[in-house]
Amino acid sequence: MASANALSSASVLCSSRQSKLGGGNQQQGQRVSYNKRTIRRFSVRANVKEIAFDQHSRAALQAGIDKLADCVGLTLGPRGRNVVLDEFGSPKVVNDGVTIARAIELPNAMENAGAALIREVASKTNDSAGDGTTTASILAREIIKHGLLSVTSGANPVSLKRGIDKTVQGLIEELQKKARPVKGRDDIRAVASISAGNDDLIGSMIADAIDKVGPDGVLSIESSSSFETTVEVEEGMEIDRGYISPQFVTNPEKLLAEFENARVLITDQKITAIKDIIPILEKTTQLRAPLLIIAEDVTGEALATLVVNKLRGVLNVVAVKAPGFGERRKAMLQDIAILTGAEYLAMDMSLLVENATIDQLGIARKVTISKDSTTLIADAASKDELQARIAQLKKELFETDSVYDSEKLAERIAKLSGGVAVIKVGAATETELEDRKLRIEDAKNATFAAIEEGIVPGGGAALVHLSTVIPAIKETFEDADERLGADIVQKALLSPAALIAQNAGVEGEVVVEKIMFSDWENGYNAMTDTYENLFEAGVIDPAKVTRCALQNAASVAGMVLTTQAIVVDKPKPKAPAAAAPEGLMV
């Protein structure tokens, strides 16, 4: 039967041509020959392309790069201007370089390819440092502009790129030597204020938040329903699981279960039989200590007995489900165990709940449990063990490539090391709210970058001072085109400071020349129109932001300089509009 079905199916699939060819065979014994197969050919047709070579391709790229960089450059410095973006809904007024870059699409496909390269610079800098996107865009534009002029004049683009890369590497080493570590709250406030567009209120707010949660803490930014911007600090470790039963509530008005100096039992096992935890319940009752049970689940007889005895006043207990899932659940339970000084009773290690002793319980100074969350405030039993755990998580954070894993690891580090600060941003209008949130996000990122790698003079002064080191770096190059690459970087380093001065209404070249012949700490303060010690004036930038801007600009510029052709989709001609019906006025 199966073969008959197979035959009938195959017969249906035969083409008409096969039927004709096999006609004679069918008459002789009704046999069908499948030796000849129809080969179905298919082809993939690409869109029509437009191709440009040499000078024409370079000119198109440069035009697109200039348009985007000019628009982004308007925002640079304390006296930079805003840009209005007409997007969905009401227009946005923004001062953030990467937001502007991402919003720009040029109608000419070849020019848009150039603009896309600057978008890449801005995005990469934003991802790696969180700020400095405008500086990176301006640096990239200048390196590309001078580099393309040299290529047109006959320089070898590969040698130029090699010279640029070597020079940038030497500058980064010099930058790391010159960077100064962050010294206290004033430096943090100054970095945050500068990054937020010289907004001292935002700078003070970021400094206050970091004072409370520490350098390993997490700053989260949310919209507020009021006009005011406030900082709220969530002290201790918070997990996103609440009490299993509302009968555990101790504060009926707020629907919270609140304990002080509670013992903590931590396990990944499911507790269903009350006999498994009777020894622990008896011990904690004798100690007159409340008990917090964090387990995979507490159900059946165990839950019913706990609830009944809680209502009768015999037990002071609350049960909470373990947070997370799978391997992440185990890791989070281990974090809680280290924080409270408990022993993690893991099933795979044969540490059963029924064999638990009072010494395996942790202690939480304060526990607050709602229906959705649990907050634990504890003094770590072993500071060394806690620091080792934080160091391990930092190592994992450094090695991971996953954005999701990075967020979760940073969250766990914050919970172990101090807490989470939430900045609730308020404003009078939606447009102002969006701009304010972007500024605070930049300030937050710049602050953590400064804590990580130190600070340098702001206002583009650090780049101008670094340009004076290039002649010494250039002397080590034997190839003439590589030395030309070093000269290109030297010219480009002057552009951010010149543009900041220009946006402040001052002649850029004059400012750059004065900075160049001053000490490392000195530069031009565009806000006050004075030349002064920028560290003392609070005009400082994170060294990491400067480094990432320079590296990413050089990387993309090198790719452009070694480009010889552009291939883009040819725009399709628009269909003519339909003629209006006769007698109808349009």
From Swiss-Prot:
Pfam families per record: Cpn60_TCP1 (PF00118)
Protein's cellular compartments: Plastid, Chloroplast
Modification type Phosphoserine: residues: S90
Expression (tissue specificity): Expressed in leaves, stems, siliques and flowers.
PROSITE patterns for the chain: CHAPERONINS_CPN60 (PS00296)
Biological process per Gene Ontology, one example term: embryo development ending in seed dormancy
Record protein name field: Chaperonin 60 subunit alpha 1, chloroplastic
Keywords: ATP-binding, Chaperone, Chloroplast, Nucleotide-binding, Phosphoprotein, Plastid, Transit peptide
Function statement: Binds RuBisCO small and large subunits and is implicated in the assembly of the enzyme oligomer. Involved in protein assisted folding. Required for proper chloroplast development.
Quaternary state and interactors: Part of the Cpn60 complex composed of 7 alpha and 7 beta subunits. This complex shows ATPase activity. The Cpn60 complex interacts with the Cpn10 complex.
Family from the record: Belongs to the chaperonin (HSP60) family.
Molecular function via GO: ATP binding; ATP-dependent protein folding chaperone
SUPFAM superfamilies per record: GroEL apical domain-like, GroEL equatorial domain-like, GroEL-intermediate domain like
Range of the transit peptide: 1-46
Induction notes from the record: Up-regulated by light.
Record keyword Nucleotide-binding present: yes
